[in-house]
Amino acid sequence: MITYAEALRLLLSEAKPIEDTETIPLMYSTGRVLAEDIASPIDVPGWDNSQMDGYALRVEDIASASQDAPVRLPVAERIAAGKIGGPLLPGTCARIFTGAPLPPGADTVVPQEDVSREGDVVAFSQTPQIGAWVRRQGSD
């Protein structure tokens, strides 16, 4: 058996940079490695959107939430994937589904599994990080 340092030295001594490249049709590129970075001319995704089914909100509206003292917010609207919601008013949340655009004013999504809902009011018992469960415009 050889040491880690010796194994690393052997690997590095045998590794050679790839200097030859070729241009091939995309359909034949499976299993290949790009020779240089490519950049999309458009943002993917094209807008901030939800990564989960849940509730879009402003973190500042539930900053004091805890297990002992949950913060309750009314549901102002329902935003399905492919639909655009209106601006989120302070002190409210929006029911949002995976892929749906984040409404203006919201900065975070809380998954439906992490809340309790009674009628049109949702109880939040923890404060997420700003940007949680949000796929940002251009992040891909």
List PLM regions with ranges.
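Short, glycine/charged-enriched hinge/interface segments at domain edges or termini
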Residues: 2, 56-140
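Short, low-complexity N-terminal leaders and the immediately following helix N-cap/first helix
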Residues: 1-67
